[in-house]
Curated annotation (Swiss-Prot):
Record-linked Pfam families: F-box (PF00646), FBD (PF08387), LRR_At5g56370 (PF24758)
Domain FBD stretches: 348-405
Key words, A-Z: Leucine-rich repeat, Repeat
Ranges: LRR repeats: 99-125, 131-157, 158-183, 207-234, 263-288, 313-341
Keyword Repeat: yes
Occurrences of domain F-box (ranges): 5-60
UniProt protein name: Putative F-box/FBD/LRR-repeat protein At1g78840
């Protein structure tokens, strides 16, 4: 029996175009050898997804120019280009020509990776753009900005002519839902003002600030009443202002060591504002520096009750043993706890002597401990096993406790498992799961 191309027989061209649009262009071109019908299908796909490394030098320019010139009236929904910026740093005018072209042809997805150019003004008034991702580009202060359909925006290592240029780009996107910012240049205070934003992620770490010689701290202003998910990884806060913002449902925050000093009234005010703001979250992730800051705060003022918090994730080292019970005491309804242990050397403090958090007695049901450090075959003097012992001995309603760890050798697993499973359990219904990998 002859092999038949059922896809070609059953599907119309426009469906095939949509299928190929989901592929990188180099893979889309390969379909031209399938049959006579497939030979030119890729040329009518309404988009490009190209990596400069797939071309000889200057080959990319010719390919894109030919593709865009095939039918200048056809729609182009997608333009994704990844460059070696060092080779294409002089090609800014050419790239801007391509952007100008697709803006007039209904582009919805624009991705520019590693081409150090300034965006053309046409992009600021694109009525069809839905997704925008920019890496290592420059943005001037446009005369006017209107992005009425833009829903997601990713800005990575983007240079702005002024703080107002960034603020305007965000505030002029009336349906923006997802915003990701990683490294922005020439911006000292990041202002996020949006009535529709529900997910905000920002990552500005120490090495990023080091490149900005005149910048040592970042200020952050958030005015987003519908925000539901917040992920902040910021090395140094200069100030934090929260306007018209409901407490989000999910918060993930990482800061640098010693960022908030309870003796300093200014940093204390910022910390007080932030803690009050996140006290109604249901899902919270903290690094150990955040835990230290909250512990220091609790020595001056009582922590608020995190009554809605049901899931907590903490990245910790041995010094956090004394801090964890203090924070858990403010989480009376916690149901799920994840602990990432990065240092297994046991602190001199005996965690078993700490105040008993209410959640251990009435609500905590699921605990997972991840060990990223190598542990030995003995349970003595190790953070992970001390935590297991503490939780099993004090959690009255816990159902599952899982420990994921790394061992030097497979023979150590049985010894360690035997000792852990011998720990006394307050909850008779608790199941203990041990998952190990080997160095």
């Amino acid at each position: 029996m002859e092999n038949k191309d059922l896809i070609s027989q059953l599907l119309p061209d426009h469906v095939l175009h949509e299928i190929l649009l989901k592929l990188a262009t180099k893979d889309s071109v390969k379909t031209s050898i399938l049959s006579t019908r497939w030979r030119y299908i890729w040329q009518r796909v309404p988009g490009l997804d190209l990596n400069q490394t797939n071309f000889r030098y200057k080959g990319l320019k010719g390919f894109v120019n030919r593709f865009l010139d095939l039918d200048k009236k056809s729609l182009i929904y997608q333009l994704k280009l990844e460059f070696d910026g060092r080779k294409y740093e002089t090609e800014g005018s050419l790239f801007n020509k391509w952007v100008d072209s697709v803006v007039t042809r209904g582009v919805q997805h624009l991705v520019n990776n590693y081409c150090p150019i300034k965006l053309p003004g046409s992009i600021s008034m694109c009525e069809t753009l839905v997704h925008l991702k920019l890496v290592e580009v420059g943005i001037d202060s446009f005369d006017s900005v209107s992005l009425p359909r833009l829903e997601t925006m990713h800005l990575l290592s983007v240079w702005f002519s002024s703080e107002a240029a960034l603020e305007r780009l965000i505030s002029s996107s009336p349906v923006l839902q997802v915003l990701y910012i990683e490294k922005v240049w020439n911006v000292e205070v990041i202002r996020v003002r949006s009535q529709t934003l529900y997910s905000l992620r920002m990552r500005i770490w120490k090495r990023d600030l080091d490149w900005n010689k005149d910048l040592t701290k970042i200020g952050l202003v958030i005015d987003a009443p519908r925000l539901k998910s917040l992920n902040l990884q910021i090395h140094r806060f200069k100030d934090l202002v929260l306007n018209s913002v409901c407490s989000p449902l999910k918060v993930d925050i990482s800061i640098s060591k010693g960022e908030f000093n309870p003796i300093n009234s200014l940093t204390m005010k910022t910390l007080r504002t932030f803690i009050a703001w996140i006290s109604n979250v249901t899902n919270l992730a903290l690094n150990y520096c955040c835990l230290e800051a909250m512990y220091a705060y609790s020595s001056s003022e009582p922590l608020p009750q995190f009554s809605n918090l049901t899931h907590l994730e903490v990245s910790m080292d041995s010094s956090c043993l004394k801090l964890l019970p203090t924070f858990l005491a403010s989480c009376p309804n916690l149901k799920s706890l994840e602990l990432w242990v990065h240092d297994h050397r046991l602190d001199i403090l005996d965690i078993s002597r700490s105040t008993m958090p209410k959640c251990l007695l009435i609500s905590l049901k699921f605990v997972t401990i991840y060990s990223t450090a190598m542990i030995s075959s003995s349970v003595e003097n190790q953070v992970e096993t001390e935590l297991v012992k503490y939780i099993l001995g004090n959690a009255a309603v816990v159902k599952e406790l899982t420990l994921r760890f790394i061992l030097w050798a497979e023979e150590h697993r049985f010894q360690l498992s035997k000792q852990i499973l011998a720990f006394p359990k307050l909850s008779s219904a608790c199941q203990v799961f041990l998952h190990s990998s080997f160095f």
